[in-house]
């Protein structure tokens, strides 16, 4: 079918440099759900607190989830949440000194944070048929990638 997987990319000869990556994404929700999150009345608990923990854990577990990612000794991870109308924005900043980039860690953190938030509020988002017509995760993107010099 195509080229077989040979393993992860060899980075042994690359220098260790400062690295930062920031990713972001949106979870679009109903006004009722937004109010429940803001009032901290969601049955499963504090959505932003639990979703922050999920994002941090996902950042640390990226090489276990994405086969070609190297295990990177992370130095920092910051998760922030902002409201944009009825959309919840998750932004994850990851930092390290290493031989390869860390944008996949930032993206994985955003996705896990948003998925956790959705899981916690899905009972509020369902319509009469059990579907989620107004709920979506969108605009997941790396907004900044920094690579220092040797």
Residue ranges and their predicted role:
Residues 1-43, 53-56, 60-70, 75-150:
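C-terminal binding/interaction regions
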């Amino acid at each position: 079918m195509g080229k077989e997987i040979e393993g992860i990319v060899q980075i042994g000869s690359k220098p260790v440099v400062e690295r930062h990556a920031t990713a972001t994404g949106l979870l679009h929700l109903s006004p009722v759900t937004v109010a429940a999150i803001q009032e901290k009345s969601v049955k499963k608990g504090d959505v932003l607190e639990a979703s922050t923990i999920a994002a941090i854990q996902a950042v640390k577990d990226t090489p276990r989830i994405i086969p070609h990612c190297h295990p990177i000794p992370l130095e920092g991870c910051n998760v922030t949440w902002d409201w944009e109308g009825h959309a919840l924005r998750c932004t994850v900043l990851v930092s390290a000194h290493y031989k390869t980039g860390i944008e996949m860690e930032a993206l994985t953190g955003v996705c896990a944070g948003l998925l956790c938030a959705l899981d916690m509020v899905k009972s509020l988002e369902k319509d009469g048929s059990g579907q989620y017509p107004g709920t979506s995760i969108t605009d997941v993107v790396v907004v900044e990638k920094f690579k220092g010099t040797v």
